């Protein structure tokens, strides 16, 4: 991000279909892991702010759930509504797309981005994997035709390729404003929220094809005692079969989930962590609007 003489601050929405690299991009820009990632679609469920202050420029990134077509359940409707809402009242929109692949869900996002009045940046992800860059041209020309006023920046969210150019362009679009957050603040989310997300990430990474998407995590206790942070997390599933999958044979899987989550928590919170996990069946929670609100999913 380039330094400027003017003090600038604004909101930047990162949007795109599921699993296109939005959270990976945010983590790389921030220089640390904040948003959870996995190879599974719909990993991100909530909007989350990632705040980067560099010199006179403060960019407030809004990491959003991927917009998707399978929106029958209340949870899916919440995620789509949350992602769409992020396009309103922001100063810049980054639309992340794959270098070659275009899906119905990309089209769904495009149709919403076309109504955005402010600056739009098309971030073409994974371009570092293409040897002959001329292969990109037909796709880029088509995208430019769909969003004629958008800037196009080829990037690699995973490896950080060309992110300096992306951040410089973002900074140029931010309005002159005093900073909204302290210089050392990196997110608006609580430590309890981040802990729950880390547990959910490890579940998604451990389970692979067995993954039950009807899972969520609640933090029941988050308490610093001396040099140790004690965290009790409740994993909610919808069926007994899902509970058995998460626990695994003789509890081996839930032990791995806990061990992996604890390591990341100790880095994030800079503290020794004692993590306890429980699994509970709560049938139909992902399609129960009242249950979703009680679990922190907001208005539907």
From Swiss-Prot:
InterPro entries: G_ERA_dom, GTP-bd, GTPase_Era-like, KH_dom-like_a/b, KH_dom_type_2, KH_sf_prok-type, P-loop_NTPase, Small_GTP-bd. Residues 155-157 are annotated as: G5. GTP binds at residues 16-23, 63-67, 125-128. Residues 8-176 form the Era-type G domain. It comes from the Bacteria. It is found in: Cytoplasm; Cell inner membrane. One of its GO terms (biological process) is ribosomal small subunit assembly. Keywords: Cell inner membrane, Cell membrane, Cytoplasm, GTP-binding, Membrane, Nucleotide-binding, Ribosome biogenesis, RNA-binding, rRNA-binding. The keyword Cell inner membrane applies. Residues 63-66 are annotated as: G3. It is a peripheral membrane protein. GO terms for molecular function: GTP binding; GTPase activity; ribosomal small subunit binding; small ribosomal subunit rRNA binding. Residues 16-23 are annotated as: G1. Residues 125-128 are annotated as: G4. GO terms for cellular component: cytosol; plasma membrane. Residues 199-283 form the KH type-2 domain. Residues 42-46 are annotated as: G2. SUPFAM superfamilies: P-loop containing nucleoside triphosphate hydrolases, Prokaryotic type KH domain (KH-domain type II). HAMAP family: GTPase_Era (MF_00367). Belongs to the TRAFAC class TrmE-Era-EngA-EngB-Septin-like GTPase superfamily. Era GTPase family. An essential GTPase that binds both GDP and GTP, with rapid nucleotide exchange. Plays a role in 16S rRNA processing and 30S ribosomal subunit biogenesis and possibly also in cell cycle regulation and energy metabolism. Monomer. This is GTPase Era. It comes from Pseudomonas syringae pv. tomato (strain ATCC BAA-871 / DC3000). The gene is era.
């Amino acid at each position: 991000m380039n330094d400027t003489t003017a003090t600038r601050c604004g909101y930047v929405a990162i949007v795109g279909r599921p699993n296109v690299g939005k959270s990976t991009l945010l983590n790389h820009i921030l220089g640390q892991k904040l948003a959870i990632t996995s190879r599974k679609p719909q990993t991100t469920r909530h909007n989350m702010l990632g705040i980067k202050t560099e010199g006179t420029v403060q960019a407030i990134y809004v990491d959003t759930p991927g917009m998707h077509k399978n929106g029958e359940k209340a949870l899916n409707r919440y995620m789509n509504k949350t992602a769409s809402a992020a396009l309103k009242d922001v100063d810049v929109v980054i639309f992340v797309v794959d270098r070659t692949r275009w899906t119905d869900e990309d089209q769904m996002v495009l149709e919403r981005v076309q109504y955005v009045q402010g600056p739009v940046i098309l971030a073409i992800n994974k371009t570092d994997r293409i040897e002959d860059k001329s292969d990109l041209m037909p796709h880029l020309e088509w995208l430019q035709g769909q969003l004629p006023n958008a800037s196009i920046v080829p990037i690699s969210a995973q490896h950080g390729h060309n992110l300096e150019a992306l951040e410089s362009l973002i900074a140029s679009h931010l309005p002159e404003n005093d900073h909204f957050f302290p210089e050392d603040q990196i997110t608006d989310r609580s430590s309890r929220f981040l802990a729950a997300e880390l547990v959910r990430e490890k579940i998604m990474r451990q389970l692979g094809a067995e993954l039950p998407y009807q899972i969520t995590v609640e933090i029941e206790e988050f308490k610093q005692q001396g040099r140790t942070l004690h965290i009790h997390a409740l994993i909610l599933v919808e069926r007994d079969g899902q509970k058995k999958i998460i626990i695994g044979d003789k509890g081996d899987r839930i032990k791995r989930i806990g061990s992996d989550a604890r390591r990341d928590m100790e880095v994030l919170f800079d503290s020794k962590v004692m993590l306890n996990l429980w699994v509970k069946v709560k049938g139909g929670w992902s399609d129960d609007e009242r249950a979703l609100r009680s679990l922190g999913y907001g208005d539907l």
